[in-house]
């Protein structure tokens, strides 16, 4: 069964939106931007909370949690991706709840909406809407265990405390928006009723377009865009790329690491293979020079980066547990590979190296 598309929110109800990401910053920030601009466009934006609202936007409310920064810098929390993730979202959630004023519809993101939802209920909000940027939390936990079994040297970003909080958010929400059929199916499998689920189609920033001229220098450029972690499948990409022996192949990781362990892992990788480059920052110039974008994630509710690659005319290799696989036409604009299978990634890379897809050579 495919997800429905008719929301229960009245067309004129004013929306208050909350998200930890900065406006337009990363995949989550792009998700926030889409919500804000859609509401602004139809005249229903009451305001939005963000760690970094758009500059000079009167509708944006900056939420500061810097007073708790010492927790992340000087306690054992700094060594735990899961606790850093939980506390970062929870501190913002509590700060938003403390500043929330009466309204009609409240939109929050998973893992950072429980206290805001409870406050919104007390203030008489008619609708509580949860934007799930991930698959169902139980699916995330299963995939995290799978990643840890293969590569146990970096902990995942989800812990049991975060899981319990997110399940409470599911229960309180009147409507849960998901961004892919994969996400929808994981919620159905977990027993969430169809009546509560809605599909939101995420869009790519229009600046992501094919280059005016192809590079054409004989290099085979592989690009990964996103956070550099075990859960995103970076060790799988290393296993595959290290066996791609072509001297014309090069790999660029566009993103940052979140743990010291990953930092050392990347340094070791670069020392052993000078074809590997790390380039945090804007992914657009890298995608416009790429021959393929690989997204080897163990789980992703959507995966904006490979969608941006497709918009640039670049074929993608994504896993079965990447939501944007909805957009992949096998053998036309990319390939879908089994999650956790570096050999399948290598096979597709070798195939693209010897015979590029037509979309990338037109």
Show the residue positions of the predicted features.
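Nucleotide-activated donor-binding/catalytic signature segment of Leloir-type glycosyltransferases, i.e.
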Residues: 263-281
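Acceptor-binding helix/loop patch of EC 2.4 sugar-transfer enzymes
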Residues: 72-82, 127-164
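Aromatic "clamp/platform" in nucleotide-sugar-dependent glycosyltransferases that forms part
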Residues: 298
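Short hydrophobic beta-strand element within catalytic cores of glycosyltransferases
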Residues: 315-318
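Membrane-proximal helix-turn-helix segments that form the acceptor-binding/catalytic region
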Residues: 93-103, 114-116, 136, 152-176
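Glycosyltransferase donor-sugar binding loop
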Residues: 225, 250-264
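Conserved donor-binding/catalytic core segment of Leloir-type glycosyltransferases
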Residues: 204-232, 238-243, 252
């Amino acid at each position: 069964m495919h997800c429905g598309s008719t929301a229960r929110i009245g067309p004129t109800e004013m929306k208050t939106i909350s998200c930890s990401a900065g406006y337009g910053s990363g995949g989550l920030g792009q998700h926030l931007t889409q919500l804000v601009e859609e509401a602004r466009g139809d005249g229903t934006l009451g305001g939005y909370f963000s760690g970094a609202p758009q500059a000079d936007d009167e509708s944006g409310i900056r939420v500061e949690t810097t007073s708790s920064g010492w927790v992340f810098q000087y306690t054992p929390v700094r060594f735990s991706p899961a606790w850093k993730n939980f506390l970062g979202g929870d501190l913002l959630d509590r700060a938003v709840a403390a500043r929330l004023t009466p309204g009609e519809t409240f939109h929050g993101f998973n893992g950072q909406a429980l206290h805001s939802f409870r406050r919104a209920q007390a203030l008489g909000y008619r609708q509580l809407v949860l934007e799930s940027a991930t698959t169902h939390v139980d699916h995330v936990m299963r995939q995290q265990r799978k990643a840890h079994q293969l590569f146990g040297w970096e902990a995942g970003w989800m812990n049991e405390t975060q899981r319990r909080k997110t399940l409470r958010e599911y229960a309180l929400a009147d409507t849960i928006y998901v961004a892919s059929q994969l996400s929808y199916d994981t919620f159905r499998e977990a027993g969430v009723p169809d009546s509560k689920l809605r599909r939101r189609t995420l869009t790519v920033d229009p600046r992501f377009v094919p280059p005016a001229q192809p590079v054409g220098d004989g290099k085979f450029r592989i690009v990964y865009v996103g956070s550099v972690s075990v859960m995103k499948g970076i060790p799988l990409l290393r296993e595959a790329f290290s066996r791609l022996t072509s001297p014309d192949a090069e790999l660029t990781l566009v993103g940052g690491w979140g743990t010291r362990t990953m930092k050392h892992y990347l340094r070791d990788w670069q020392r052993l293979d000078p074809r590997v480059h790390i380039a945090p920052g804007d992914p657009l110039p890298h995608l416009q020079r790429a021959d393929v974008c690989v997204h080897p994630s163990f789980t992703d509710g959507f995966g904006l980066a490979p969608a941006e690659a497709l918009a640039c005319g670049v074929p993608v290799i994504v896993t079965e547990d990447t939501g944007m696989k909805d957009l992949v036409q096998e053998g036309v604009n990319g390939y879908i590979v089994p999650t956790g299978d570096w050999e399948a990634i290598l096979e597709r890379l070798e195939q693209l190296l010897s015979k590029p897809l037509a979309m990338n050579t037109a």
